[in-house]
Amino acid sequence: MRIHEFGTEHEKTVLLLHSACLSWRMFQPAAERLQTQYHLIIPALPAHDPDEKTPYTSVEAIAAELGDWLEQRGISALWGLYGVSMGGAVALRLLADGKVAVRTCVLDAAITPYRAPRWLTRGFSLRNYLVIRFAQRHLALIRRAFPAQRFGQAAVEDDCMILGRMDRRDVWRVFDSCFHYPLPKRLQTAARVSYWYGSKEYFQRALDIRHVRRLLPETAFVAFPDCAHAEFVAGQPEAFAARLAETLELDGSDI
């Protein structure tokens, strides 16, 4: 897993974890601003590296590898941890592992594991697998479903490029792992956690919101008006960078 760093001269370290079917490049527009204030660490997660073919492993394996990498680099604490969608699942698993202290964590439409019998939830994995496999064969539909004026041209093309590179095993592992990775019933962390989501995806995220509320009762939930899944970070990078920096700089009295 290759890891990209920006703003290494800064003391405050922020780890950014990208969505499924997009690459680390989704953060490049926002990173132009954020790197003036933070040391940014942006991994290219397995099966999503535009420059290197790597197989997808699992949410928990990725979190463990990142935790080990941070320890080896002597990074014992993160000023901020941000993950969107699949990246949010990895962020949750990092919190559960507890290898690195986190001051502030933002879970943006983070996927949480299903709390239902495995035979049923595997059906949900299959449904999402088939949707993505269909999209891989009809990339024009991706451009139609995610218009560049809302999600940004670069993000839409990045999505199509990553989908074109992923094989069927990677697609299956991504969704099966995101829906079934292990988490404790109650997560103990000193991090201040926010869960972001777009108002247009509320019903898709309702179970995730409920799960996070049980896991982390002190979580602040923030809805972004007129936004779909990952639209705020992908389509409004300047506003996203400003809002993330604002969230990371809150002190205890602001929470």
What are these regions (language model features)?
Residues A116-R118, A135-L187:
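Conserved alpha/beta-hydrolase catalytic His-Asp/Glu region
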Residues S199-Q204, A230:
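Acidic catalytic loop of the alpha/beta-hydrolase fold
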Residues T189, Y195-Y197:
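Short beta-strand/loop motif that positions the catalytic acidic residue
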Residues A96, V102-R133:
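Flexible "cap/lid" loop of the alpha/beta hydrolase fold
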Residues E5-E52:
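Conserved HGGG/HGGXW glycine-rich cap/lid loop of the alpha/beta-hydrolase fold
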Residues F224-E238:
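Catalytic histidine-centered segment of alpha/beta-hydrolase-like enzymes
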Residues I41-G80:
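Active-site loop/oxyanion-hole signature of alpha/beta-hydrolase fold enzymes
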Residues G83-G87, A91:
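Gly/Ala-rich beta-loop-alpha elbow adjacent to hydrolase catalytic centers
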